[in-house]
Amino acid sequence: MALFLLTCLLAVFSAATAQSSLLGPSSIFGPGEVNVLEGDSVSITCYYPTTSVTRHSRKFWCREEESGRCVTLASTGYTSQEYSGRGKLTDFPDKGEFVVTVDQLTQNDSGSYKCGVGVNGRGLDFGVNVLVSQKPEPDDVVYKQYESYTVTITCPFTYATRQLKKSFYKVEDGELVLIIDSSSKEAKDPRYKGRITLQIQSTTAKEFTVTIKHLQLNDAGQYVCQSGSDPTAEEQNVDLRLLTPGLLYGNLGGSVTFECALDSEDANAVASLRQVRGGNVVIDSQGTIDPAFEGRILFTKAENGHFSVVIAGLRKEDTGNYLCGVQSNGQSGDGPTQLRQLFVNEEIDVSRSPPVLKGFPGGSVTIRCPYNPKRSDSHLQLYLWEGSQTRHLLVDSGEGLVQKDYTGRLALFEEPGNGTFSVVLNQLTAEDEGFYWCVSDDDESLTTSVKLQIVDGEPSPTIDKFTAVQGEPVEITCHFPCKYFSSEKYWCKWNDHGCEDLPTKLSSSGDLVKCNNNLVLTLTLDSVSEDDEGWYWCGAKDGHEFEEVAAVRVELTEPAKVAVEPAKVPVDPAKAAPAPAEEKAKARCPVPRRRQWYPLSRKLRTSCPEPRLLAEEVAVQSAEDPASGSRASVDASSASGQSGSAKVLISTLVPLGLVLAAGAMAVAIARARHRRNVDRVSIGSYRTDISMSDLENSREFGAIDNPSACPDARETALGGKDELATATESTVEIEEPKKAKRSSKEEADLAYSAFLLQSNTIAAEHQDGPKEA
């Protein structure tokens, strides 16, 4: 158990030592001087940085002894016996402050104290001097003034004592101590040397004045104005109280608010905030601004002398005393004033961006801002500073609001976990130069200010031009410089609440993001529709930190309706396309796949020409076999040829005669061969001569390879009458599919079967006589 307690003590000691070395003594701040009357109460506020260590560390209030030891009077969860029932310490970790309250003060409470964090004497503390003055009598004249300021005390006298010596005393331990008199212009007390004067305006005056400059804490107390000498001297008791200035504590880069409440009924009075050091005006109600505070200060005026001043982007040189005042003529010292003491903690810098950002025309900048991530209902905002009393809201995360002028140009992003939000502003122009304020509505201390400058340069990344046609795909290409090679690159679609990342793989919406090693990022939108219209951003980021961004707007265009005529390509006559009639014949009569046999006596009723024959071949066959007139091709222009001139007739008949002569010779040769291979066959009383070679081509005996392709081919004309007109158009030769080879015996059997079938049919017709179809 003892070992466990020792370990805990060592851990506490180590934590205290670590935070002391991390923050330093300057990070704790409180009032340097406290002046209070005997019997009154006092509340002393001490400030500390709001880090994860200090929030949960021990807070203490101790009194210094002559030995240098600091005795704890109150701390977190502890109150000493001396303070029992009249003193306590209250911590406010969210605000980074704790308050020590002490009641029923006595003069014994005067002394030196320390308020701090951690362990006593480890450096994380701040010294406070407390002075408890004797309570004045009811007829005492009370004067109040701030430390380091000047006070003028008026002492009246009567006509009876106008010629007597005038003196000014201080009451110390019940005794009167001479400070100055009218016999000498120098102070009698060395503590006031060079700081005090006594004046009588004229011999007829009924008062004299005592002026004390550069007031110190020990100047507070009771004084006596005396005209004459005892026991007939005229006296007046004076109570001088030093006011404790209002304390303001801020972190480097953060903000503070001066709340000034001065009673003034003059509506035309000039309200101002001045620095005590130098006396220069920081800002006033007439628009005057100290150049050192330009762009980071805002004045808000109320009524009856009440106003507030916000200073953002705190710097270490802002530390010091400030004076709120209301003057009728605009001059200091003319009206009521209030002193404020500002302390800037240099140990912690809350800003996330440098005080000055630079951007290029057409480029982008990212303003990073602090906020408290533990407060989920915070409204994160960005303002444009427009003067001493105006700032213009650009974006609000709580309302999802983006000003119309910044549509597609500005978006706010929260970075989870690290208390930072980023505002990206792109498509920069010279008009964007100025000061921008980051604001978290629930913690004004985190308000920061950034100055934006537009300088010459080229923006990056860049986006290629494109055209988005409704219903068609579009690719948008984004190019990055080499400095972003290791950065994460992305496409997103902008909206009022930010910019939604597009998926890295094909999604249901058809959006595709891909990137190659050449630092080119391509956004592909499939079948662009109205839902795809809007602003798209292409950018790079390192973790949660946004880098440069380029923006482009997708707008739909209607598909172009242009009549395009096909180009005229010269055609080789030898390779000319078939005539329309030939194409129709091809469509009606595809390549035959199987054969079907019909009786030889029936003429086929079909409009399908022989697919294997060209137009020239049809003409030749007609010459070879005049009897087969149904398969001959008739020239459509023969009628007009007969009515032509004799020259045309001769030029036509001569070639025809040559063709007929050649045909007659071919027929003679064919018949000579036919006689050698003719066999006489008798079926009943019917006799005929047939040659086996005549049956080699089954089509000459009425066979159809694929009757299903030509339904009309199944109908025949009886009695030698053809009911269908023979096609007169020239046909294009269609290559027949290769036929399976048969043996001679198979071909003979097949031909003989066809012959028997045809013979039976002819015999039946001969017995029954001809019939009309």
Curated annotation (Swiss-Prot):
Residues 619-641, 725-746 are annotated as: Disordered. The modification Phosphoserine is found at S682, S691, S698, S744. Residues 19-647 are extracellular. Residues 1-18 form the signal peptide. Residues 25-131, 138-232, 233-340, 352-455, 461-557 form the Ig-like V-type domain. Residues 632-641 have a biased composition (Low complexity). GO terms for biological process: immunoglobulin transcytosis in epithelial cells mediated by polymeric immunoglobulin receptor. Glycans are attached at K88, N108, N418. GO terms for molecular function: transmembrane signaling receptor activity. One of its GO terms (cellular component) is secretory IgA immunoglobulin complex. The chain crosses the membrane at residues 648-670. Disulfide bonds join C46-C115, C155-C225, C260-C324, C369-C438, C478-C538. The Ig-like V-type 1/D1 domain contains three complementarity determining region-like loops CDR1-3, which mediate interaction with IgA and IgM. PANTHER family: POLYMERIC IMMUNOGLOBULIN RECEPTOR (PTHR11860:SF82), POLYMERIC-IMMUNOGLOBULIN RECEPTOR (PTHR11860). Interacts (mainly via CDR1-like domain) with dimeric IgA. Interacts (mainly via CDR2-like domain) with pentameric IgM. This is Polymeric immunoglobulin receptor. It comes from Oryctolagus cuniculus. The lineage of its organism: Eukaryota, Metazoa, Chordata, Craniata, Vertebrata.
